[in-house]
Structure formats: C-alpha cells, structure tokens
Amino acid sequence: MAQGSGDQRAVGVADPEESSPNMIVYCKIEDIITKMQDDKTGGVPIRTVKSFLSKIPSVVTGTDIVQWLMKNLSIEDPVEAIHLGSLIAAQGYIFPISDHVLTMKDDGTFYRFQAPYFWPSNCWEPENTDYAIYLCKRTMQNKARLELADYEAENLARLQRAFARKWEFIFMQAEAQVKIDRKKDKTERKILDSQERAFWDVHRPVPGCVNTTEMDIRKCRRLKNPQKVKKSVYGVTEESQAQSPVHVLSQPIRKTTKEDIRKQITFLNAQIDRHCLKMSKVAESLIAYTEQYVEYDPLITPAEPSNPWISDDVALWDIEMSKEPSQQRVKRWGFSFDEILKDQVGRDQFLRFLESEFSSENLRFWLAVQDLKKQPLQDVAKRVEEIWQEFLAPGAPSAINLDSHSYEITSQNVKDGGRYTFEDAQEHIYKLMKSDSYARFLRSNAYQDLLLAKKKGKSLAGKRLTGLMQSS
C-alpha cells in the first residue's frame, strides 16, 4: 500500500501558499497522517484482517485512530477527537473501506490511508471525462465491491448522454485502465480500487454530503496566481485535457499578464449576464410551497387521524385496511404529476382513468422502465427485450408514441441493453403524460367525484358525530 511520508509530499505544487488558500490546512493534516503511519514513533497499527474466506489488507479501526489522536494531540474529550478525525476524513486522507460517506466513527469500522498521489494538496480539479472513465471502468469489473451505487449509476447515465459523441473514446480509455489493473497483484489492486473510490467520494461526493473541494470565493480572489491547472487523473490527453496528471515541481509562478486580465474581465462580464432569480421571487416561491404542504407536515399540523403509535386512536389502521384514500391524499395528487406517481393508490386511479380512455400504454411503459432500473443485473437484458417487444418494436401490442429522435436513440441503446436503455423514451413519455393525460385526469369526473366523495363523507361523519353528542 502506498503510505504517506514527508518525501512523498513532493507531488504537490511549487509554492503551496501561492496555489491554494487551504494549503496550510493540508500541510498540517499531512504532518498528522505521516506521524500516524510511522511505526517507529508509535503510529497507528496497520494490519491485515481475516474476514471469512478473504483477507482485508492494510486497515486500521476507527477506535485506534481516535485513541491515537487523543494520546498524541493531547485531546481529552473523545467527541473532539472524533470531530477532528471526521474533518481529516472529509478531506480524503482517511476513508472507510465500505462506505461512501467520509466520516469517523469510534468503533471497529475499518479505515484505510489515502495514497499521497490522491491527496488534495496536489490541487486536483478532475474533469467529468475522468469521472466517466472511472465509472465506466467500474461497470467492466464483475465484482460485488465495485458495483455502482444508485447515485453513481445515475451520474453515469447523465455523463453518457453528455459525452455521447466521444463515449467510444471514454470506453476505450476505461478498457485500457482495466487491462493495466489486471496485471497488478490482487492485494495491491484491492487497495488501489478503494483509494480511487475514496478520491472520487471527495470530488464527486454522495448527494447530501458537503463538497470539501469547493473554495470560498473570497479566498479565490486573494490568490496571486488564479490560474487553476486542470489535471487528468488517468493521464488522458485531449484538447480539453492536455495537462500532466501531476504538477511539475520546478514550474515557476508567472506574473499576471494583460491577457490574463482580459480573460478575467470576460469571465466576470459573463457572470453578470447570468440569469439569477431575485430573492423576492425565491422567497415568494418558498412561501407558496410551504403554505401548500403545511397541512401535510405533522410537526406543524396535527395528523388526521392521529398517529396510533402515540395515541389510542386506531382509525388509521381501519383507513389503510379499507384501501380508500383520504381526502388529504386525493387532494395532494393535484399538486403535481410527481405526487400522483409517488402514491401507489394514485397511480392505480390514474391507470384506471387512462384505461377508460384506451391510452394506458404510456403509464405502463413508464412503470416498466422504473421497474427495470431495480432489476438484478442478470435479468436486465431479458427485461429490456420484453419492454421493447411490448411497447416499441414494429407491430408492438401496446405501441407508444415517440418522436423520431427519441426512437432512434432508444433503438441504438437496445443493441447493448442496460438499466438506462429507455431513459430518453421514458423522459419523453413523462413529459407527454404531464402535459396531456395528467391535466385531463384532474379535470375528469373520476377525480372530481373521488375528491367530492371524500369531502361529502367527511361532512356526513361530522354531522353524525354532532348528533351523537347532542343526544347524549
């Protein structure tokens, strides 16, 4: 495993203080990491752990790291040590081997040290092309530990659409990387795979996690050398990526020229012309959304019927058993098309309406594609063929109406079927249903009768309850 050392920090930039406002922090973290890995001065014990039929090489536990921080940095409170460990992990210097969320836990969770090549002090600014190569490479290796997470699969589909014209080049680069990796020792390959994954967890974090590579705009303005060098992680050389994957130590820091100033002025003028919403409009939209959903928030509006887990009212169970949607539920379907698609009962009602108009194939196709994304990999190809034959093939029994562009793209995708083969077709059908079928459903007697029936039922129940109270 590639371990950190003082000499290995030489892969950084020429003058740290001139290159990144965060370099002082990186240097301090790297000093801690170097000492943590130094066996001679009492570093953290790095060991290989046996796990059932396999071995997990070069790992440390979260407890060992926390205890080392408390002992060597004179930290008395374990919470403070865990917080410091989480900050170091968030920068990618330490990472959990089985989780995409970079945080520190004071337990037996296994962690691994990042290779110095991937340290943030190297001022990485990886391109989307590199990310596409990485994700594509992961899909080529049939290993459980390398399976894409849901958000990674979505990112891959988005990148595949964005780089459609040069996807063949990306695929070839990924294949070349896989061939190189296969020549490496099994243990070394396992370690490098995890380090590479941790690198991308820092630069393309899990949705909901903070991106620690983003820099404060005020710090950026204070830089004497604002030219950020873009580097390819895999050494890809293109017009947009001609830089070496590592900065050269001897590279001098050049002075700002007139051309640099002109480029900066052009960039700032472009920023001025960008379309930005006024804060008043944003606040107005947020208030409208809050007012619309306030009655569905149990923290603000008491739920009706009340929660049976915290009260003696069991009416909720009766409603669920009856399979009849409440008035609130029916009303919510009218908020947006996504609301009715999220609700199982709403989808069933919408499907019945479409069947009555002999146009249910659009919704059935959309649901089939959603189900395809959740299928096991071994069943995907078969399911893709079934969907094609049912909805898109010439003479299909439930043919859907696609524009020529979407149909052509889908026809090409079917030749090499995957979970996202019908992405363009699904998006087209979604927009079609949202603009046409959904609007007609809200105006239909089926929806209006359902909504009025719930209101009428509620008013009759209220009158019945009032009568019982008066008689008693």
Swiss-Prot record:
GO cellular component, one term: nucleus
Keyword annotations: Cell membrane, Cytoplasm, GTPase activation, Membrane, Nucleus, Signal transduction inhibitor
Signal peptide coordinates: none
Chief location category: cytoplasm
Sample GO molecular function, one term: GTPase activity
Domain RGS: 336-441
Biological process according to GO: G protein-coupled receptor signaling pathway; intracellular signal transduction; negative regulation of signal transduction; positive regulation of GTPase activity; regulation of G protein-coupled receptor signaling pathway
PROSITE patterns per UniProt: DEP, RGS
DEP domain mapped to chain residues: 40-115
Domain G protein gamma span(s) in chain numbering: 261-330
Domain characteristics, as noted in the entry: The RGS domain interacts avidly with Galpha and mediates the acceleration of Galpha-mediated GTP hydrolysis.
Record function comment: Regulates G protein-coupled receptor signaling cascades. Inhibits signal transduction by increasing the GTPase activity of G protein alpha subunits, thereby driving them into their inactive GDP-bound form. The RGS6/GNB5 dimer enhances GNAO1 GTPase activity.
Complexes and interactors: Interacts with GNB5. Interacts with RGS7BP, leading to regulate the subcellular location of the heterodimer formed with GNB5. Interacts with GNAI1.
Protein name: Regulator of G-protein signaling 6
Organism expressing this protein natively: Homo sapiens (Human)
